[in-house]
Structures are given as C-alpha cells and as structure tokens.
Amino acid sequence: MHERNLIHRDLKPENIMLGLGPNSNIVHLIDFGLTRSVIDSKTGQHLPFVKNKNLIGTCRYVSINAHLGYEMSRRDDMLTLGNVMLYLFKGYLPWQSLSINKNSARFKALGEAKKWHYDNDLFDGCPPVFR
C-alpha cells in the first residue's frame, strides 16, 4: 500500500484479516474508505505537511500526530499499526478507558494519555520487538 503512495488512515483490528489455510500467513487490509494518496495528482509531488487537520481514523489507535492535528503520513499508519499490535498483544490499551463525552475534549485527552504512556509505561511486559 505504501509502495503505491497510499495511506490507509484507519488501521484497526476490525480492518485486518488473515488468510485461510495455506495463506494463513498473509495479512489483508480492508475498508479503504479513508485511504488517500500522499502524492498530488496534479503535480506528482508529495503532499505538503499541513497542521490543524481534523482527526481521521479510530481514536483508540491513531498516532499522536493525528491527535495534534497534523496531516497523516505513512509514518502515522505504522504508528497506528503498532498501537493495534500492542492492543492485540495486551488485550487493551491504557488510554481506552477514558470516558469523556465531548469529542474535542476526548480527542485531546486521548492524545495526552498516549504521549504519557509512550514516554513511561506503554511497553511494560512486552517483548523487545515492541521497543
């Protein structure tokens, strides 16, 4: 996907499928509704970095950059995939229990919680591959 200059922008367990039988080692992505190109179709150039973007994707998994309002990139897909893998390994993410009703306040609180856990204890109990 990234080799084709596309970013998914909504990676989550529900959008990741495993092949069957002899193809059980193949991972398939689904739901490309938020996918976009990182290349401008008119100029052929990489899209510029932009701030103050609305959060796109599933809050539980998106990168801290998405919470900060930065344009999402391949890097954010990879960080989001890391959050998904942590969720699958641990069975939870430390920030998923936050319950704030107002979306803008919740997005901000989730971003702050993610930053704190990344800086402190997020990888506790995880194999070295997560570090």
Located regions from the model:
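Anionic group-transfer/hydrolysis microenvironments
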Residues: 12, 33, 65, 79
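Catalytic-loop of the protein kinase fold
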Residues: 2-20
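Conserved C-lobe activation region of Hanks-type protein kinase-like domains
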Residues: 21, 66-123
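Conserved C-terminal C-lobe helix
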Residues: 125-131
